[in-house]
């Protein structure tokens, strides 16, 4: 049994939608990123990579590599999870916290859980996604960007 923690943040800019947890959320702006800017899936990738001692998402999908420009983060997550399985582990459970003043995440949480569960080949009951605000404090509170944290438990197969 191993645990991993991940964190990601992206700044608003350009046109929407915002992609979070593999789900497109209508919003007046998108997130500035080399890939699709999905902070939730990036945090999950980092948590999984951390759990197997394999560094971070930037090491595996560097933003200096044109191959990953505009990449679908669901593809990245599936690739990372294949590395987890190659090391002899499977997901136990996952807990994700999205920190954003806007857009509102609640209507999209179930779809996020479903998408993530599919990509991680697990029962939806093993995936929890929640959202909170920072009570209008800091960059997320000023609607300048979105942050996300993820914690995973993986077990030997």
Curated annotation (Swiss-Prot):
Cofactor note: Binds 1 divalent metal cation per subunit.
InterPro entries referenced in this protein's UniProt entry, alphabetically: MECDP_synthase, MECDP_synthase_CS, MECDP_synthase_sf
Chain residues that bind a divalent metal cation: 8, 10, 42
Top EC class, one word: lyase
Pathway where it operates: Isoprenoid biosynthesis; isopentenyl diphosphate biosynthesis via DXP pathway; isopentenyl diphosphate from 1-deoxy-D-xylulose 5-phosphate: step 4/6
GO molecular-function term, one example from the UniProt record: metal ion binding
Binding positions (4-CDP-2-C-methyl-D-erythritol 2-phosphate): 8-10, 34-35, 56-58, 61-65, 100-106, 132-135, 139, 142
Keywords: Isoprene biosynthesis, Lyase, Metal-binding
SUPFAM superfamilies according to UniProt: IpsF-like (SSF69765)
Site (Transition state stabilizer): 34, 133
PROSITE patterns: ISPF (PS01350)
Reaction catalysed by this enzyme: 4-CDP-2-C-methyl-D-erythritol 2-phosphate = 2-C-methyl-D-erythritol 2,4-cyclic diphosphate + CMP
Cofactor: a divalent metal cation
One GO-annotated biological process of the protein: isopentenyl diphosphate biosynthetic process, methylerythritol 4-phosphate pathway
Role description: Involved in the biosynthesis of isopentenyl diphosphate (IPP) and dimethylallyl diphosphate (DMAPP), two major building blocks of isoprenoid compounds. Catalyzes the conversion of 4-diphosphocytidyl-2-C-methyl-D-erythritol 2-phosphate (CDP-ME2P) to 2-C-methyl-D-erythritol 2,4-cyclodiphosphate (ME-CPP) with a corresponding release of cytidine 5-monophosphate (CMP).
Quaternary assembly: Homotrimer.
Family assignment from sequence similarity: Belongs to the IspF family.
Protein name: 2-C-methyl-D-erythritol 2,4-cyclodiphosphate synthase
Gene: ispF
